[in-house]
């Protein structure tokens, strides 16, 4: 129990920091788990991950409303609307977004838990069939083409991912193995550093921020329950779509709300909270990652030789409770903690954001240096080889950043390339 409490508290702390600081992406939670996955059982990995992503959305709105610094990417959709709100309206927003986030978080947790009771291999054995998996993965690959509408770059990323993904299946032709030798020694952690983390150093952060000290007291405005329910459902659905779940949910809820700027903001923040939880459903039900968070968790499961659709129903440390049971209970408890913390100490959060904002580059450089140092220490390759490969992936990542192209197709095919090639080869032999 002590370990469980420590994991939840650690997740809450990282979730708050991730939400308050725009330099830290939402996938930083599972990224941190690379350093501890060997000593943590599955329930602890899932709890930490889901607690962090939930907190990043809770506190992303706190950062945005108090200082106009988008604490997380999905907040960008309503940033300009804050200019048209009065002080009292912004005070009420802090309360209403917290309530909306709490309701959305609980509803999506219940949805995830109930859905997994029915959508699993025991009840639906066809989920493991080659036909179903081919259809599922093909739809996912096709949907990746529409993330940023950059079809050519997405296709190139998919091809690169296939070319360098680990090939352990000897049904694959020797050509794949020959291409792989060009990238001998890389790790998925290195790819994440290069294409996602290090490019954040090149992002320009707006230095003009506002910190209205009169926002330190929130106002308990009236909650529009219909709007909250609608946005929660939109977020649940958006969370099942491959791509940046939180941003997709925010944009969808924002654009379908026509009752004023304040309601649009509440809708966006409510939707993104439910989406970051339900995006776990494809991973836990089908072992199918659909965004950066779930891709990292999928890789962690591979490192621990876990098949998630069956592993979540095994007994946890709590005896009769399964891994899924203890995860759902812990996540629900953390949501109430987030609600309390996000409606108190507002002035402290705002001052923390302002004090760190001017040092954001230094903070990121320090974080990246530590991450590279630890990975280099554990890498099974030479320093020159490591730095060369990291430079290659970083160049790709910076290019994608400035071209506004998502690295998700590359990560998806690196993780699942071996399985995808095997599936398509089997399908070809069976049906042609």
Predicted segment positions?
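Re-entrant/interfacial helical elements at transmembrane boundaries that shape
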Residues: 26-36, 64-84, 114, 159, ...
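Helix-loop-helix hairpins and the membrane-proximal interhelical loops
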Residues: 1-43, 121-126, 174-260, 368-379, ...
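Alpha-helical transmembrane segments of multi-pass membrane proteins
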Residues: 14, 91-104, 226, 230, ...
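Transmembrane alpha-helix interface/packing and boundary motifs in multi-pass membrane proteins
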Residues: 10-26, 56-68, 142-147, 232-242, ...
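Short helix-coil transition sites and intra-membrane helix breaks within transmembrane domains
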Residues: 17-27, 65-76, 238-248, 268-273, ...
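Membrane-interface alpha-helices at helix entry/exit sites of multi-pass transporters
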Residues: 42-47, 81-103, 258-268, 404-405
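Membrane-embedded alpha-helical segments of transport systems
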Residues: 54-59, 96-112, 266-306, 333-337, ...
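Membrane-embedded alpha-helical modules
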Residues: 97-206, 305-432
């Amino acid at each position: 129990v002590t370990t469980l409490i420590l994991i939840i508290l650690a997740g809450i702390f990282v979730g708050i920091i991730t939400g308050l600081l725009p330099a830290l992406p939402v996938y930083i939670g599972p990224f941190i788990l690379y350093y501890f996955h060997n000593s943590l059982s599955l329930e602890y990995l899932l709890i930490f991950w889901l607690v962090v992503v939930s907190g990043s959305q809770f506190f992303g709105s706190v950062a945005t409303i108090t200082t106009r610094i988008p604490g997380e990417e999905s907040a960008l959709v309503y940033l300009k609307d804050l200019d048209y709100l009065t002080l009292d309206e912004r005070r009420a927003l802090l309360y209403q977004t917290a309530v909306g986030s709490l309701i959305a978080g609980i509803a999506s947790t219940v949805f995830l838990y109930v859905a997994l009771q029915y959508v699993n291999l025991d009840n639906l054995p066809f989920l493991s069939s080659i036909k179903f998996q081919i259809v599922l993965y093909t739809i996912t690959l096709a949907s990746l083409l529409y993330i940023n509408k950059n079809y050519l770059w997405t296709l190139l990323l998919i091809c690169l991912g296939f070319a360098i993904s680990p090939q352990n299946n000897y049904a694959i032709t020797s050509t794949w193995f020959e291409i792989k030798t060009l990238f001998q020694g890389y790790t998925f952690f290195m790819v994440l550093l290069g294409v996602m983390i290090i490019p954040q150093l090149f992002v320009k952060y707006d230095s003009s921020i506002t910190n209205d000290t009169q926002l330190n007291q929130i106002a308990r405005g009236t909650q529009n329950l219909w709007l909250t329910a609608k946005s929660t459902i939109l977020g649940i659905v958006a969370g099942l779509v491959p791509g940046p779940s939180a941003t997709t949910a925010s944009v969808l809820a924002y654009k379908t709300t026509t009752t004023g700027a304040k309601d649009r903001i509440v809708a966006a923040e409510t939707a993104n909270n439910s989406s970051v939880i339900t995006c776990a459903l494809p991973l836990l039900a089908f072992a199918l990652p659909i965004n950066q968070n779930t891709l990292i968790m999928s890789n962690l499961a591979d490192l621990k030789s876990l098949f998630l659709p069956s592993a979540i129903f095994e007994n946890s440390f709590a005896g009769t409770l399964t891994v899924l049971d203890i995860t759902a209970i812990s996540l629900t408890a953390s949501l109430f903690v987030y609600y309390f913390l996000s409606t108190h100490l507002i002035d402290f959060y705002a001052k923390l954001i302002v004090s760190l904002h001017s040092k954001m580059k230094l903070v990121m450089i320090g974080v990246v240096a530590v991450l590279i140092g630890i990975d280099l220490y554990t890498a099974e390759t030479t320093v020159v080889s490591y730095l060369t490969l990291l430079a290659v992936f970083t160049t790709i990542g910076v290019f994608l950043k400035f071209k506004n192209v998502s690295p998700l197709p590359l990560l998806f095919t690196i993780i699942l390339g071996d399985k995808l090639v095997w599936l398509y080869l089997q399908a070809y032999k069976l049906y042609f």
